């Protein structure tokens, strides 16, 4: 599993305290659905996903994005046990939803882009490296139940 230094934990936690979960979550998930349109098949009950503007304005996309980032917030509180934190979600996404685990990496990368957009100069190379490590660790934890 991923090991975070005290400095990485501090950097991640500090920035996380400033994140608007609803806004950033909706934008990250929306970007995933726009940039990687094949991921839309997992969200067929979300209604209109016919264009970038429809996706980015879709209330179900925003709500699910918020839900995703709320789970990420739980992970940030438990950085030393990402696998345990995401055990249930890993099982759900593997056994019931059959989500390609590669999509977790893609969403993590979109989140890093969104954070960089929102935090600008505050999103230094050090901050980016810590967040890349965080989203990679989450992707590994979510993929854990896959065979």
UniProtKB/Swiss-Prot annotation:
Alphabetically list the UniProt keywords: Heme, Iron, Metal-binding, Oxygen transport, Transport
The UniProt entry's GO biological process terms, in alphabetical order, are: hydrogen peroxide catabolic process
Gene from which the chain derives: HBG
Q: What does this protein do?
A: Gamma chains make up the fetal hemoglobin F, in combination with alpha chains.
The protein's matches in CDD domains, at most eight in alphabetical order, are given as:
Hb-beta-like
Subunit and partners:
Heterotetramer of two alpha chains and two gamma chains in fetal hemoglobin (Hb F).
Q: What is the lineage of its organism?
A: Eukaryota, Metazoa, Chordata, Craniata, Vertebrata
Q: Which PANTHER family match?
A: HEMOGLOBIN FAMILY MEMBER (PTHR11442), HEMOGLOBIN SUBUNIT GAMMA-1 (PTHR11442:SF52)
State where heme b binds. Answer: 64, 93
Q: Name it.
A: Hemoglobin subunit gamma
Q: In which tissues is it expressed?
A: Red blood cells.
Question: Which GO terms label this protein's molecular function in UniProt?
Answer: haptoglobin binding; heme binding; hemoglobin alpha binding; metal ion binding; organic acid binding; oxygen binding; oxygen carrier activity; peroxidase activity
Family stated for the protein in its record: Belongs to the globin family.
Q: Where is the Globin domain?
A: 3-147
Name the Pfam families on file: Globin
Q: Which GO terms describe its cellular component?
A: blood microparticle; haptoglobin-hemoglobin complex; hemoglobin complex
